Amino acid sequence: MKTQKIKKRFVLLCVLAVLLALIIWTAWGNTALMVNTISVSSDRIPAGFSGYRIAQVSDLHNAEFGAGNTKLLQTISENTPNIIVITGDLIDMNHTNMDTVLDFIKNAVQIAPIYYVTGNHEAALSQYDKLKEGLKSVGVIVLEDKAVQLENNGSTVTLIGLSDPNFAIRNDVFDETPAMVSTKLNDLLESENDYTILLSHRPELFETYINCGVDLVFSGHAHGGQFRLPFIGGLVAPNQGLFPKYDAGLYTDANTNMVVSRGIGNSIIPFRFNNRPEVVLVELRSES
């Protein structure tokens, strides 16, 4: 009888130890910011942009890493990017803190020029105009269905930014999302022969980006599938559902590369599992 009780206690202690270890590991994994370095090569990348470094911040959702986001700022700064791109959901519609976001941006823009596009949370935010003006006032380039040229070492590439499709619903313009995005992209690409980099929050529109002939896409939104399962990948992502096709990392199809950031913060689901927050660093390599 005593032996059975000892065995039961031992099993219970083992279960509790495993649960405690999982809790500690998950807590660490939600705060241990990492850098995911990705190299993108193409013969369309001009020689002047070989070695060009782009830091991507996505889906911050008002999160803070260190007081005043010092850890996040240090992580970006240590990787010496040429530019920083923010691919939406900088704020969170459920717990918006404009001061936290703008304080981070004021410091980040001292590291490198910032180019910003919206996500679905900005589209749902009644104070979006205030956010936009705050970003622009400190020098952020806000791209709302716009294209700009980047110059480096005598070469140029075209950077395009798309507003999140939910802004069309907000403005009472109802349209099928892929068709609407395709029309916008084709208009912006009509006269462009440069290597094209697209900032767009939505990875599920990859087929549209391919069909429009975009060279490189920076996206987010999927939060890495929130819970990453060994040998499987992400469990669930907005607008993709269970076992999302585009949840994290580099995807290549035809001549289009898409980088999907796992993001940094959380939103409706307040924690991640096996899915550390990340800053993505893309280094361009010319094959021309």
Where are these regions (language model features)?
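Conserved beta-sheet core of the metallophosphoesterase superfamily
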Residues: 202-280
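Catalytic metal-binding/acid-base residues of hydrolase active sites
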Residues: 61, 91, 121-122, 147-148, ...
